[in-house]
Amino acid sequence: MFMLRQGQAHDAQALCTLIFATAPELLPVVLGDKQCLKTYLAHALMLPNGQYSAARHQVLVIHDQQSQDEQVVGCITLWHDDLGADFVNQTISAMINVFTSEQLTQIARINKTLLSVFVPPSRNELALGHISVSPEYQGLGLGKKLIAYGIRQAKLLGKQQVVIDVDSDNEQAVCFYESCDFMTTASTQLALTGQTFLRMVYRL
């Protein structure tokens, strides 16, 4: 039986794998080699707030009634235009605690480029991020459960649109979001990786 709940610190290891799977080309360019990236995520996921905080994610878990064990098999996070100062401060704090000053300067430089491609959500939008399902559980409708959760939250927050950025080469993902009634409204190339990202929108 699958259940959706708020992420917790003990979900960090599973979330690290799921989050990396959402952007395997981009994340190492932004946050360093695989080991550096894992170190950063391991730290950031344990914080109570911030972009990569486990608590900022909803996780899909499969529950074994006999053993009472849980396995995290999917995740999603939500971003809007007013995440608060604590979100920003803890995102920055996580970086300061892991990266050198040279690395931080590089990340800040790259971030300016990223913001021109991954445009932050406007006041009437809710952005979905880190949508991921473990490969062995794909094809069971779990991705649609995550999308449905995001749409419900957008309605509760009074938003007019749900947005997501998708690598245009990820045909499986593009087709999936189209099947969930998302439409492509923009296409932008990211020179850092040579990828083209589609801004896909679901209108409420």
Predicted regions and their residues:
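Conserved N-terminal entry element of GNAT/NAT acetyltransferase domains
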Residues: 1-10, 73, 203
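Conserved GNAT-fold acetyl-CoA-binding loop/helix
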Residues: 23-45, 85, 96-101
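Active-site rim helix/loop that mediates acceptor-substrate recognition in acyltransferases
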Residues: 34-57, 65
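Conserved beta-strand in the GNAT
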Residues: 59, 69-80, 127, 132
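Conserved acyl-donor/pantetheine-binding loop and adjacent beta-alpha core of acyl/acetyltransferases
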Residues: 82-125
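C-terminal "cap" of GNAT-fold acetyltransferases
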Residues: 96, 159-171, 179-180, 186-204
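Conserved GNAT acetyl-CoA-binding A-motif
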Residues: 124-126, 154-165
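Conserved acetyl-CoA-binding loop-helix of GNAT-fold acetyltransferases
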Residues: 139-152, 175-179
